[in-house]
C-alpha cells in the first residue's frame, strides 16, 4: 500500500472519530440558556446531560475510572479511563481531555472546553455506539438517536444508595432500554434488550459513580451475553 495513501486514511479515520464524539458534545450542550426552558428536557436528560456534575471538582484534577467488559458473546477485558480537568482562563472548572481505554481499543476523543456535565458520559456512549455498530453493522447515528430519544421519553430516574471508597453515598440511578420498543429491532435482535444504567451522585468527584450496560442471555439461568461497566476509582490533584 502506498505509504501516503495509508497515512491519509489514518488521518481521515481519526477525524471521523473526533467528529462523531463531538456530535455527542454538541447534543449535550443544548442548555436552557440556549433558548430552551428546563421543562423542555426530561428528568433523565437533565440528570445525564445537563447537570453541573463537575461543580464539586477543583481543577486541576484527574478522575480515574476502571472499565470492564465481560459476557459470553466474546472475550472480555479490563482497562482504564482517565479524565484530566484543567481550569478555564477565568479559573473556573473545567476544560477537559480524556483517555478512554488503551492500545487498539483506545477511543479518539475531542477536548471539551467549559465542561459542566461530566464528559466521561459522552465518551462512554460514543464507545458504546461504536461497539453496537461493530457487532450489528447498523448505522452509528441510528443507535445514537435511539439512545437520545429514549433518554427523553423512556428513561426511569430513581433515588439510589451506592458506595464510594467504602462509604455509603446517596444519588440517583437513570435506567433505560433504547432498543426494546424499536420496530427495527429484528435487525439486531440479539442485542435489542440492552439495558443502560447511570449511577449518579453529587458525593462523587465528577458526579458519575458508574455506568453499566447489560444484555441478558436468551435463557434466564444463563450468564449475561454482554456486560460493560465503568466505575470511578478516585480523583487526584
Features from the language model and the residues they span:
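Surface-exposed, glycine/proline- and aromatic-rich loop segments on solvent-exposed faces
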Residues: 106-131
Amino acid at each position: 500500500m502506498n505509504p501516503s495513501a495509508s497515512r491519509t486514511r489514518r488521518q481521515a479515520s481519526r477525524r471521523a472519530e473526533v467528529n462523531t464524539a463531538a456530535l455527542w458534545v454538541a447534543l449535550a450542550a443544548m442548555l436552557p440558556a440556549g433558548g430552551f426552558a428546563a421543562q423542555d428536557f426530561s428528568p433523565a436528560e437533565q440528570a445525564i446531560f445537563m447537570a453541573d456534575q463537575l461543580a464539586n471538582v477543583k481543577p486541576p484534577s484527574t478522575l480515574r475510572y476502571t472499565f470492564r467488559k465481560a459476557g459470553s458473546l466474546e472475550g472480555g477485558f479490563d482497562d482504564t479511563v482517565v479524565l484530566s480537568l484543567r481550569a478555564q482562563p477565568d479559573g473556573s472548572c473545567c476544560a477537559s481531555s480524556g483517555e478512554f481505554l488503551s492500545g487498539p481499543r483506545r477511543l479518539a476523543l475531542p477536548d471539551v472546553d467549559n465542561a459542566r456535565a461530566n464528559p466521561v458520559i459522552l465518551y462512554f456512549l460514543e464507545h458504546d455506539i461504536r461497539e453496537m455498530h461493530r457487532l450489528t453493522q447498523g448505522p452509528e447515528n441510528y443507535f445514537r438517536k435511539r439512545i437520545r430519544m429514549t433518554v427523553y421519553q423512556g428513561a426511569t430516574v430513581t433515588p439510589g444508595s451506592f458506595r464510594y471508597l467504602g462509604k455509603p453515598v446517596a444519588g440517583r440511578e437513570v435506567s433505560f432500554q433504547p432498543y426494546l420498543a424499536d420496530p427495527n429491532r429484528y435487525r439486531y435482535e440479539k442485542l435489542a434488550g440492552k439495558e443502560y444504567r447511570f449511577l449518579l451522585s453529587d458525593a462523587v468527584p465528577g458526579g458519575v459513580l458508574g455506568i453499566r450496560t447489560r444484555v441478558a442471555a436468551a435463557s434466564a439461568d444463563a450468564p449475561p451475553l454482554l456486560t460493560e461497566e465503568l466505575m470511578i476509582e478516585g480523583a487526584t490533584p
